[in-house]
Amino acid sequence: MNPNTIDSIIKQLIASHTTISTMESCTSGLIASLITDTEGASAIFPGGYVTYLNETKVFVGVDPSVIEIHGVYSPECAEAMARTVQENLHTAIAIGITGTTGNLDPNNADSVQGVVYFCILYKAQAHTFTFQTNVSGMTRHEIKQLYAEQVFAELELSLIHI
């Protein structure tokens, strides 16, 4: 992951006064951490959530029926996560991400190894993405970095239209 690219994205958000928030599951707060690596990020990043458990997602406001109907590992859940954090923190952009970082999740039957779902929400417009890769031989940290790279790559493309 190129830190200069992320820095450039965050500086663009700062310059345009465009706020951003995150709700992360499989990346465990890495996206938020990378956002705040840029000096001045507090001007556009009020915070985010790390919601590793389904119960935590529901606690912060994700509708439990989304998880029950579509599963926690789904584009619908990623979008619900983004909408929830956007509503709670009143940001222009919100990111929701859910998926697995290794073995299948015994607590969620819908888990597929190496598949991540994320949503970039700008105002009310949702863009959902599914990314699948072979994660065998990768550490959990490497997988999280790969997923974060995908999010920032799509965010960079989205900013062209903002």
Residue ranges and their predicted role:
Residues 1-160:
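Short alpha-helical segments enriched in small residues
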